[in-house]
Amino acid sequence: MLGPLLFVIFINDLEDSVEGLLDILRKFADDTKLGQEVTREEDRDRLQQALDESCLWAERWGMQFNVSKCKVMHMGTSNPGYQYHMGGQALETTDEERDIGVMITASLKPSAQCAKAAKTAQAVLGQLARAFHYRDRHVFMRLYKQYVRPHLEFSTQAWSPWTAGDKACLEKVQERAVRMVSGLKSDDYSERLSELGLPTLEERRHQADMAMVHKILCGRGSLDSSQWFERAADSVRATRSSANPLNLKVRQGRLEIRRNFFSNRVVNSWNDIPSDIRETVRSENFQRKYKQLRASR
């Protein structure tokens, strides 16, 4: 595992070559993303200059980018859609790309990721069904939780669906799984979940959201809470109820995608949690208490 680490160290000075030119530069292993808000030709020129500087940086280190794998994604309805080049070659434009295991689209809607996750999970579930003809509830549920459900829940804080169709696309996989279990009395999905002690996938996504909010606000990990949330008490229009130092403020958004973005969709649910639970220090204790709270409602 030393090779990947040495490679990351080797490319760590890429930022120096494009410093001051971009709004966004993100690296993960050998994947690099450059981003810039482009509304005029000057913005386009800055982004193109960053691409040119990146190519010069690679040449200095005796490397070259695989231009055939480099893509441009134009986001926003008013995006002018300029053409960009690397090493004299025009970059291909794409509306959909996989980024660290998640399908990202130009519209930023999660439908493509939901479809991919459901398809992968269905394939694994089918393999389990063929391998186990008698599906004892204890054994089969352990297999489902370990091999199927993770595909439906990977990084959902980044792409949690909000439309009924996308939610159903994921939930149908779990519904199929519980119908495979032998010995259950009811044919009703919700009653089968109750017999098996399983929550819906939507409920698990909600609890995962709250757990992530707690981690960010407690300063765990690399995310800066001030970049994600605004404290309601800091607002100039704070009321007596919103002045609770634990409460967050919803940032106004005109578009549906903005209203359902993680930092907005979690606010009301977070503010509804009793203060004594939100003040819990350890993440695992918070998750346990919040799970109990949801079960009691």
Residue ranges and their predicted role:
Residues 4-35:
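Active-site palm subdomain of RNA-directed nucleic acid polymerases
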Residues 32-56, 161:
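Catalytic palm subdomain of template-directed nucleic-acid polymerases
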Residues 89-157:
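Basic, alpha-helical interaction scaffolds
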Residues 164-297:
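Short linear motifs embedded in intrinsically disordered, charge-biased segments
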Residues 63-97:
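Short, conserved micro-motifs composed of acidic
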Residues 1-6, 35-40, 93, 105-107, ...:
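Short, conserved non-catalytic motifs in the polymerase core
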